[in-house]
């Protein structure tokens, strides 16, 4: 794998546990600042479903040999620069940073066929430039009823758009036609971003 990555080292990336939506926003911001010509090829991807119960494997917070965890939602970053190359940058995975799309999807999501329908995963894919403009969160979802934090927040101020409204729910929602970007099932997501060996060979001729 080439070493010409958007983010040379995972240690150089902004990261706070349990704030994946903000971690990915910071990745988008970093690309805009350091590699602006690549921003149009980058995406923020939310994974969730109606019941907000999505199993993911190979996660740092996971348990057992397979490191599986059930999240209410998760967010990761995609760089799709070429017809034969698509990379996933996930700050919470135990897979390499980055990982080729096919390997990431195969090991992180496996298949919906063996899962109950209520655990099927859906994906909201948002262009990075759109995400930088429209995402807004006052972090209310991380507070208990008494106002204390479920998990310590990032040290920087909340990310608020010009509307100054908390809209995290619009990104987690997996209803097609609502919210920014496009919503895909797992199979549709793979069809849109997987670069098959045949396509790679054709483009390398």
From Swiss-Prot:
<dbReference type="InterPro" id="IPR037132">
    <property type="entry name" value="N_Gln_amidohydro_ab_roll_sf"/>
</dbReference>
<feature type="active site">
    <location>
        <position position="20"/>
    </location>
</feature>
<keyword id="KW-0378">Hydrolase</keyword>
<dbReference type="InterPro" id="IPR023128">
    <property type="entry name" value="Prot_N_Gln_amidohydro_ab_roll"/>
</dbReference>
<protein>
    <recommendedName>
        <fullName>Protein N-terminal glutamine amidohydrolase</fullName>
        <ecNumber>3.5.1.122</ecNumber>
    </recommendedName>
</protein>
<comment type="similarity">
    <text>Belongs to the NTAQ1 family.</text>
</comment>
<dbReference type="Pfam" id="PF09764">
    <property type="entry name" value="Nt_Gln_amidase"/>
</dbReference>
<comment type="function">
    <text>Mediates the side-chain deamidation of N-terminal glutamine residues to glutamate, an important step in N-end rule pathway of protein degradation. Conversion of the resulting N-terminal glutamine to glutamate renders the protein susceptible to arginylation, polyubiquitination and degradation as specified by the N-end rule. Does not act on substrates with internal or C-terminal glutamine and does not act on non-glutamine residues in any position.</text>
</comment>
<feature type="active site">
    <location>
        <position position="74"/>
    </location>
</feature>
<dbReference type="GO" id="GO:0005634">
    <property type="term" value="C:nucleus"/>
</dbReference>
<dbReference type="GO" id="GO:0070773">
    <property type="term" value="F:protein-N-terminal glutamine amidohydrolase activity"/>
</dbReference>
<dbReference type="InterPro" id="IPR039733">
    <property type="entry name" value="NTAQ1"/>
</dbReference>
<dbReference type="GO" id="GO:0005829">
    <property type="term" value="C:cytosol"/>
</dbReference>
<dbReference type="GO" id="GO:0008418">
    <property type="term" value="F:protein-N-terminal asparagine amidohydrolase activity"/>
</dbReference>
<feature type="active site">
    <location>
        <position position="90"/>
    </location>
</feature>
<comment type="subunit">
    <text>Monomer.</text>
</comment>
